Amino acid sequence: MPLSYQHFRRLLLLDNEAGPLEEELPRLADEDLNHRVAEDLNLQLPNVSIPWTHKVGNFTGLYSSTVPVFNPDWLTPSFPDIHLHQDLIQKCEQFVGPLTKNEVRRLKLIMPARFYPKVTKYFPLDKGIKPYYPEHVVNHYFKTRHYLHTLWKAGILYKRESTHSASFCGSPYSWEQELQHGSTSLNGEKGHGTESFCAQSSGILSRPPVGSTIQSKFQQSRLGLQHKQGQLANGKQGRSGRLWSRVHTPTRWPSGVEPSGTGHSDNLATRSTSRFHQSEVRKETNPSLSTSKGHTSTGHAVELNTVPPSTVGSESKGSVSSCWWLQFRNTEPCSDYCLSHIINLLEDWGPCYEHGEHHIRTPRTPSRVTGGVFLVDKNPHNTTESRLVVDFSQFSRGTTRVSWPKFAVPNLQSLTNLLSSNLSWLSLDVSAAFYHLPLHPAAMPHLLVGSSGLSRYVARVSSTSRIYNHQHGSLQNLHHSCSRNLYVSLLLLYQTFGRKLHLYSHPIILGFRKIPMGVGLSPFLLAQFTSAICSVVRRAFPHCLAFSYMDDLVLGAKSVQHLESLYTAVTNFLLSVGIHLNTAKTKWWGYSLHFMGYIIGSWGTLPQEHIVQKIKDCFRKLPVNRPIDWKVCQRIVGLLGFAAPFTQCGYPALMPLYACITAKQAFVFSPTYKAFLCKQYMNLYPVARQRPGLCQVFADATPTGWGLAIGHQRMRGTFVAPLPIHTAELLAACFARSRSGADIIGTDNSVVLSRKYTSFPWLLGCAANWILRGTSFVYVPSALNPADDPSRGRLGLCRPLLRLPFRPTTGRTSLYADSPPVPSHLPARVHFASPLHVAWRPP
């Protein structure tokens, strides 16, 4: 007869009518009993032939591809002018005095952050934007491109200008050296010497941002490089020849990277394997086409070979031969859905390219990407805005993967010890926290994103296109990309983006200037940064508590008035160092702090309501007697594991599920096991804060017997059969707790001390978790343990009782500056010693 739920509860000693603990508990360690119960509850994981269940409620397999939903109305979030001040350490020192070594070390880590992987794989530009939404290819392309453009404008990305130069917007840092041509400054106070102009290490001309100074020195010829003084002709033939040949090397065009749609008279340029168009070279060799600010350049080609000097820049609009978009203007429409109808809507489509306010030299950056991007909903609660997902997973894979640094995450007990108090709380929202931390420009070539331009993208998606054919000149090839879908999509997008459609249809390569989210280094750096900032705040306001986990910052103070003053002072400080807070999202929690999925109050910690609701839904949909795919079990265990510390039996109750996942077997829930788990999770108990105290109760065991020292009283007992030493020690600790009721117990066993009962026999682990819930353990060496003699059967000898203090730990939660203890009572209305009047100093 299968084991009923009531019988199972009694077996686990969860009912009150159980017999004496010393007799009942050792029975649960019996291997035979554990096997029989596992068999009865169907926990033996037989190899089932029934088909597995791959979906339980919302849970599907961990690696199953849930189809993301594309929202054509996604808004691109705005990024404020985020610029973390470079003198951050000095500003913190002005605020709080000298910083501790830990704080300085952490702040230096991110000023600037460095990232040097062992190996970087480069992918073709076609893989820049992932075809995540096959039904909305064009729409997704433009929305992603707009998102990238927004990030570049906000100073979060560099734009690759050539193999060795990049441009960006926003305020420069001191390590971002402005691009110098040899000894010449950007602003062109001195002339550009020919030597330095040619000395780019890759042999590609870099774009002079200010055209006029060079123009005065160089006559405009087909190359734009004939010096008035005849320096090039005078003994420098070899170098100018080298420059000319490099300019003509087809595979080496800089990142203006547009597949050319027209036949040039020069065959080499036409057949270039990468088919990048010549706008960059054209722009560099004819500086008259660069605007004086170096901001935008007209995308109108000047043919390299046959243009006489007089025609350069003479047409206001220039020739459109190299721009795929503008070529449609001069062609006959091929159908009602020809793109020329859209291109003819506007006379001025704006520039082909934009350039940043600042230009810097970079290490060699190929015209490739190292990761793909796509858009998803910002979060489950906000589907109106999009979020950019960057896939740099190449750095976490294979033999050359980067092993990311580890950092301490506060465990539940540490968090409760630290934050469970009667303070008033609020949470601060740091907007785009990752994008605060600057990256060294040397990391840029490893973190490249971008797109190959609309024509290539459309060609790749539409199977009929012959754009890769070398016959670029034929118009019917140009019109091969015309289709009803593309026409309708572009017409709708035209209402959103207007003339920017032209800019976005060109290829672009961007590198990260601030840390991206898709790299394992980023969470580590963010955690170091926010923990150092909180440490500074805690020392500046000693009677308050500031704590952070990643971008979640919380502040606590003894009264609401105190908290308001603290909030003003801290936000002013954070804004003064360049940390951008979203003040609209500040949450005032009162006395129950919501943090990291928990509710933390003076009574302890519980999981937040939405997690409890999820667990209820999970149990409602959990099938009985049906094999469930182990990947779905991973999802179920993830959810139940979060709330396990709040249940009677804790993690040990989930061990059968863990075992099936490890064995990659399907799991079958028996009605009894499901009822047992369900009951466990319907009644959640708070995890309380540990209190300091003196240890008065000690436990010890040998494989054959146990001994207790409770105050001056000594007790001993024997086991029916010898037990493994860890099991015996755990039983002794349980007896000590049940006999004395003490919540601080001394033991010399490290496994009991760790409070992880998952490696014990299953039934014993479940029962012990409930008996020892809320118990704190203190380590006492065997030689000093007063319970050592009784456990060996010697009651007559009494070792003196130790005075062993227990101090609750906050783990390795990066609290370098200990805050002074907070008095537990609320102050009187205006008590003379109120922290507002005495301890609190304005910044």
From Swiss-Prot:
Site (Priming of reverse-transcription by covalently linking the first nucleotide of the (-)DNA): 63
Domain (Reverse transcriptase): residue spans on this chain: 357-600
One of the protein's GO biological processes: symbiont-mediated suppression of host innate immune response
Renumbered residue ranges of the record's region Terminal protein domain (TP): 1-177
Catalytic activity: DNA(n) + a 2'-deoxyribonucleoside 5'-triphosphate = DNA(n+1) + diphosphate; Endonucleolytic cleavage to 5'-phosphomonoester
Region of interest (Disordered), residue spans: 228-316
Start and end residues of each stretch annotated as Spacer: 178-346
GO molecular function: DNA binding; DNA-directed DNA polymerase activity; metal ion binding; RNA-directed DNA polymerase activity; RNA-DNA hybrid ribonuclease activity
Transmembrane regions: none
UniProt keyword annotation of DNA-binding present: yes
Signal peptide, first to last residue: none
Region listing for Polymerase/reverse transcriptase domain (RT), in residue ranges: 347-690
Binding positions for Mg(2+) per the UniProt entry: 429, 551-552
Keywords: DNA replication, DNA-binding, DNA-directed DNA polymerase, Endonuclease, Host-virus interaction, Hydrolase, Inhibition of host innate immune response by virus, Inhibition of host RLR pathway by virus, Magnesium, Metal-binding, Multifunctional enzyme, Nuclease, Nucleotidyltransferase, RNA-directed DNA polymerase, Transferase, Viral immunoevasion
Biased composition (Polar residues): 262-276, 286-299, 307-316
Activity regulation (UniProt): Activated by host HSP70 and HSP40 in vitro to be able to bind the epsilon loop of the pgRNA. Because deletion of the RNase H region renders the protein partly chaperone-independent, the chaperones may be needed indirectly to relieve occlusion of the RNA-binding site by this domain. Inhibited by several reverse-transcriptase inhibitors: Lamivudine, Adefovir and Entecavir.
EC number, as in UniProt: 2.7.7.7, 2.7.7.49, 3.1.26.4
Record's keyword annotation contains Iron: no
Stretches assigned to coiled coil: none
Additional note from the record: Hepadnaviral virions contain probably just one P protein molecule per particle.
Notes concerning its domains: Terminal protein domain (TP) is hepadnavirus-specific. Spacer domain is highly variable and separates the TP and RT domains. Polymerase/reverse-transcriptase domain (RT) and ribonuclease H domain (RH) are similar to retrovirus reverse transcriptase/RNase H.
Function (record text): Multifunctional enzyme that converts the viral RNA genome into dsDNA in viral cytoplasmic capsids. This enzyme displays a DNA polymerase activity that can copy either DNA or RNA templates, and a ribonuclease H (RNase H) activity that cleaves the RNA strand of RNA-DNA heteroduplexes in a partially processive 3'- to 5'-endonucleasic mode. Neo-synthesized pregenomic RNA (pgRNA) are encapsidated together with the P protein, and reverse-transcribed inside the nucleocapsid.
Similarity annotation: Belongs to the hepadnaviridae P protein family.
The protein's name in its UniProt record: Protein P
Organism: Hepatitis B virus genotype H subtype adw4 (isolate Nicaragua/2928Nic/1997)
Gene responsible for this protein: P
